[in-house]
Amino acid sequence: MRIMSLDVGSRTIGIACSDALLMTAQGIETIRRTSLEKDFNRLQELIAEYEVHELVVGMPKNMNGTKGERAKKTEEFVAKMKEVIDLPVTYWDERLSTVMAERQLIAADVSRKKRKSVIDKMAAVVILQGYLDRLQFNK
């Protein structure tokens, strides 16, 4: 059983999945959003393929910890998703996850064009790895 993370944006959803031991996060793909039905269908396919038992969704908070418009849209997405996907969902603070992902990609000398295509997936990796590290710390 694995944990999957989602970095939900207005145009894309970055997806990452844990290993079976719940130690490391790997980027899976970036879904280009077209409709909720197609988004949820693809998520269901990935959940089945990776045998996922829990979802972690990045919560885009403001730097002062408050929830803004993007956070409300994420909560709306999750509420609709729960109507078709019956898995526990944990929100995880995603402040600076995209910045950290961008820095990792720059350090790895990934081209600007390639960074743009993988940044959402990498942000999902940062979100999930933070969650997995917390699970290990609390053991």
State the predicted function of each range.
Residues 2-3, 11-139:
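Phosphate- and other anionic-substrate recognition elements at nucleic-acid/protein interfaces
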Residues 7:
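Conserved catalytic-loop position in the HRD/HxD motif
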